[in-house]
Amino acid sequence: KFKLTTLLAICAALSLGTLGATTPAEAATSNKQAAKRKAKPVSKVEKRSEPRAEAQDSDDLLLKSAAVVVQDQSSGEVLFEKNSDAVLPIASITKLMTAMVVLDAQLPLTETLTIGGEDVDTLKGTRSRLKVGTQLSREDMLLLALMASENRAASALSHHYPGGAAAFIEAMNHKAAAIGLKDTRFSDPTGLTAANVSSARDLTKMVSAASHYPLIRELSTTSERTMLVGGRPIAFHNTNTLVRSPASGWEIAVSKTGYIREAGKFLVMQAWLNNKPVVIVLLDSWGRLTRIGDANRIK
């Protein structure tokens, strides 16, 4: 009886030991499964990083100006555009057309012009350092209109045109049609009125046309000039900081800025990028440095 009971106990123990045993192959499999379970959090971290890498690879040009055109002037290829057909007030960009009309008339550049009461801005009340009675040559008036965006200088140029200011504005619109500007209308030679309108696409044509006038290229990119006004020297500076700063690294052939409250800030240029002439039009830029920042992003 004792032997039978002992034998049964030994068999039971052996049976339990067999059920709980693990072969070497089974142990290895179990360890691999455990390792996989521990590796899962690492794989999730790697997946979260992938979208960030894709965003960094994006080469889209993000510009803040409301309407933009960047065009290769040689081929005519539009390299970038944004709202290029939107018709907007163009402020002092107008003065490029003013200069072309003056030069097309082939009037004597050395002729003395006088700032009159009719040249004072009664629309916006802008200030000027050219007092009524100031006398300067036609070329100096052109310089101040293009470089320093002097409104009285631009107005005086129109009043000293054959037929007066009305004939001058008519000539501006005739010139616009002649160079293929479909969205462009002029009502004054300064750009102070919001009735002077154009599109970024049209302005690429206007800047390109202006670039064929050597004097416009010279005067619009003059950094600064001191003139005798009323018997005392006054320093005038270019309104485009990229022209004034050699450290900017820009090679600019034509430049004009503009601003009116209704339409923000503007910048148009013909510049050399990668050894090619490129026309840049930036319209409706509201930040203080937005147009300059956009130009540098394009570069």
Language-model features and meaning:
Residues 1-9:
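Bacterial N-terminal signal peptides that target proteins for export
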Residues 18-31:
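Signal peptide processing junction and immediate N-terminal pro/mature segment
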